């Protein structure tokens, strides 16, 4: 007689320990779904987890020593999924939320991302965090930095660590070319960023409270498109890029989602400023999928600000007609002249003085900040890594959710702000203006 035994092995890997795999040791084949790493974080360190399915031969007399009742009590957990539907007053009702953040070559934005994590006012004790680190460059230290910050996050010392790092950076008194753009930003924008990060603990009393759990996943998916602004936003790479991102999102969802999660919140790491109550605000509208508006600041010579996420939109007749002219596998890339859909974008509906509680129904959604009920993932909604109704990833996610009868909405006047990433043309213009300044001084 054979008994199938699946067990979990934990081996301790402390931050800074030589046993943490270095970047060059972590290159993985993107085609093997079993080729991944899982790390659990506590206040004391990072523990590597390996899940191995093993078939062991067990003698018949050994089985007689364990009753069915014993097996039932020790191996079976019962969850009534009716208890995890997701309420619009989630924190009040104890709804556990799964916070998901994909990371790739993200070490430069991690201080900002972790500040924004601590700034969340949704009860930290009800939030499970799962990071997915994937397809990073060989010399990138995103994984190691996430290790360090996550441990500090859980033992309450991250604020001090980030302040110390900032002081060391400022003491160097070196202004890099990457900082030049700040001289051309609207002063009120610079002031708002300083206000957001200069005394963050004053934002709410539970800023340092540890989260319910932190898990870090490491898995590559074969993404080779660069992380520069121009690389990521070139129209010719959008279809391929979005499908690979869909695979990564789906993998992370399946790996991290547990039966007791009521809500799932997706968040990009490069959000610069965002209200701390964003989760409660999105949740309060009682939609199955809800997104905020996403803008980004710009230098004064480009107009100060600009809509960033054009993937949240209301379908149009022109968009539907365009889809009819395309091949089944073609992906409509919203916001590009090559695909004239004439859709109403959530971003362009924004009124800076509008009612932040106003909601509009959407068909497509962007992935910068998505709150969704966990039940929709359990019922089959996902981020298509293939062409679905001539869309992929988050826009197809919105279409699929709508097609399956779930409510999808957006807040046109509730805005979060993405960082400004200078394009190649922007950098050329800044260089030209700097040369002009030097000529005027001389």
Curated annotation (Swiss-Prot):
<dbReference type="Pfam" id="PF03452">
    <property type="entry name" value="Anp1"/>
</dbReference>
<dbReference type="InterPro" id="IPR029044">
    <property type="entry name" value="Nucleotide-diphossugar_trans"/>
</dbReference>
<dbReference type="GO" id="GO:0006487">
    <property type="term" value="P:protein N-linked glycosylation"/>
</dbReference>
<protein>
    <recommendedName>
        <fullName>Vanadate resistance protein</fullName>
    </recommendedName>
</protein>
<dbReference type="GO" id="GO:0030182">
    <property type="term" value="P:neuron differentiation"/>
</dbReference>
<dbReference type="GO" id="GO:0000032">
    <property type="term" value="P:cell wall mannoprotein biosynthetic process"/>
</dbReference>
<comment type="similarity">
    <text>Belongs to the ANP1/MMN9/VAN1 family.</text>
</comment>
<dbReference type="InterPro" id="IPR052086">
    <property type="entry name" value="Mannan_Polymerase_Subunit"/>
</dbReference>
<dbReference type="GO" id="GO:0000009">
    <property type="term" value="F:alpha-1,6-mannosyltransferase activity"/>
</dbReference>
<dbReference type="GO" id="GO:0000136">
    <property type="term" value="C:mannan polymerase complex"/>
</dbReference>
């Amino acid at each position: 007689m054979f008994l199938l035994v699946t067990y979990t092995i934990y081996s301790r890997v402390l931050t800074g320990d030589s046993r943490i795999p270095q970047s060059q040791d972590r290159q993985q084949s993107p085609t093997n779904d079993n080729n991944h790493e899982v790390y659990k974080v506590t206040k004391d360190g990072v523990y590597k987890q390996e899940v191995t399915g093993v078939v062991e031969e067990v003698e018949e007399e050994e089985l007689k020593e364990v009753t069915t009742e014993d097996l039932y009590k020790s191996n079976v957990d019962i969850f009534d999924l009716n208890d995890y539907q997701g309420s619009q007053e989630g924190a009040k009702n104890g709804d556990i939320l799964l916070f998901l953040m994909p990371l790739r070559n993200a070490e430069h934005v991690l201080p900002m991302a972790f500040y924004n994590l601590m700034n969340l006012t949704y009860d930290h004790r009800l939030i499970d965090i799962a990071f997915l680190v994937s397809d990073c460059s060989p010399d990138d230290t995103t994984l190691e930095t996430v290790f360090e910050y996550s441990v500090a996050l859980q033992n309450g010392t991250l604020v001090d660590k980030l302040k110390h790092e900032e002081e060391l950076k400022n003491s160097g008194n070196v202004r890099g070319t990457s900082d030049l753009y700040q001289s051309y930003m609207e002063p009120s924008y610079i002031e708002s960023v300083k206000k957001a990060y200069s005394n963050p603990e004053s934002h709410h009393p539970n800023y340092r409270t540890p989260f319910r759990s932190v898990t870090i996943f490491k898995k590559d998916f074969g993404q080779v498109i660069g992380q520069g602004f121009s690389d990521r936003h070139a129209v010719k790479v959008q279809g391929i890029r979005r499908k690979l991102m869909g695979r990564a999102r789906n993998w992370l969802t399946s790996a991290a989602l547990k039966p007791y999660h009521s809500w799932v919140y997706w968040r990009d790491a490069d959000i610069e400023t965002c209200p701390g109550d964003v989760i409660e605000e999105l949740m309060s509208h009682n939609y199955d999928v809800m997104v905020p508006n996403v803008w980004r600041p710009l230098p004064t010579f480009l107009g100060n600000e600009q809509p960033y996420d054009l993937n949240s939109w209301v379908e149009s007749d022109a968009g539907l007609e365009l889809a009819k002219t395309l091949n089944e596998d073609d992906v409509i890339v919203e916001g590009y002249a090559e695909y004239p859909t004439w859709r109403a974008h959530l971003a362009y509906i924004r009124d800076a003085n509008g009612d932040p509680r106003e909601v509009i129904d959407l068909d497509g959604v962007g992935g910068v900040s998505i709150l969704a009920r966990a039940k929709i993932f359990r019922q089959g909604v996902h981020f298509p890594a293939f062409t679905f109704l001539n869309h992929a990833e988050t826009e197809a996610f919105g279409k699929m959710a709508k097609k399956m009868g779930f409510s999808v909405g957006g807040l046109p006047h509730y805005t979060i702000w993405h960082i400004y990433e200078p394009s190649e043309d922007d950098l050329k213009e800044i260089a030209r203006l700097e040369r002009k300044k030097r000529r005027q001084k001389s």
